[in-house]
C-alpha cells in the first residue's frame, strides 16, 4: 500500500 509496507521481498 506504501513504501513502509515492505516485508522481505514483498512491497505492497
Swiss-Prot record:
GO cellular component, one term: extracellular region
Pfam families, alphabetized: Urotensin_II
Claim: Disulfide bond is one of the keywords in the record: yes
Keyword tags: Disulfide bond, Hormone, Secreted
Keyword Secreted among record annotations: yes
Record-stated family: Belongs to the urotensin-2 family.
Full protein name: Urotensin-2
Organism: Gillichthys mirabilis (Long-jawed mudsucker)
Amino acid at each position: 500500500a506504501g513504501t513502509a509496507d515492505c516485508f522481505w521481498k514483498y512491497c505492497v
